[in-house]
Amino acid sequence: MKLFIILATATLLIAATQAKYLRDEGFDLGETQMSSKCTRQVKMMEPELVKCNRYIAMDIMDDKYEEALSRIQGEGCESEEKFLRGCCVAMKEMEDECVCEWMKMMVENQKGRIGETLMRKGIRDLKELPNKCGISEMECHSRGNWYYV
């Protein structure tokens, strides 16, 4: 029984550490090369965009750990759907170009913070957000290449 408690605690601590990086309550806009127009849009929509972080964190981490973290931190239990709705509000209010820049910033901010497997899953989830929000296909430009989200 003691071993189970130790393993459960260790797993929760690992999940808490990983989720912390995915759920930063703000965006580090200083390290990214975002246009001033998009920087303004991201700052204006930041409270809703943070919900995108939470949605992705809940999706890539085991929901049980995320729920436990929410309760420990006094946030109550909020559903993935609630975070997705808030995220969609922000993405629909922003110009496509700025959504693309924000998504790139999200990926850049997580590099080196989380493991490669979680990073790949997070990127996949991030690319699926526009579709989940009912936003038509977007053209994004990165490193001289065009790609569709």
Swiss-Prot record:
Tissue-specific expression: Expressed in seeds (at protein level). Expressed in seeds.
Chain residue ranges for the region called No IgE-binding: 41-53, 68-81, 84-95, 97-105, 121-131
SUPFAM superfamilies cross-referenced by the UniProt entry: Bifunctional inhibitor/lipid-transfer protein/seed storage 2S albumin
Secretion signal, residue range per the UniProt entry: 1-22
Transmembrane segments: none
InterPro entries linked: Bifun_inhib/LTP/seed_sf, Bifunc_inhib/LTP/seed_store, Napin/2SS/CON
Pfam families: Tryp_alpha_amyl
Phenotypic consequence of residue 52 to G: 21% inhibitory efficiency in a competitive IgE inhibition ELISA
SS bond partners: 38-98, 52-87, 88-133, 100-140
Keyword hit for Signal: yes
Keywords: Allergen, Disulfide bond, IgE-binding protein, Seed storage protein, Signal, Storage protein
Gene3D superfamilies in alphabetical order: Plant lipid-transfer and hydrophobic proteins
Molecular function via GO: IgE binding; nutrient reservoir activity
Region (IgE-binding): 108-117, 132-141
Effect of mutating residue 38 to G: No effect in a competitive IgE inhibition ELISA
PANTHER family recorded: 2S SEED STORAGE PROTEIN 1-RELATED, 2S SULFUR-RICH SEED STORAGE PROTEIN 2-LIKE
Homology family: Belongs to the 2S seed storage albumins family.
Function: Seed storage protein.
Identification of the protein by name: 2S seed storage albumin protein
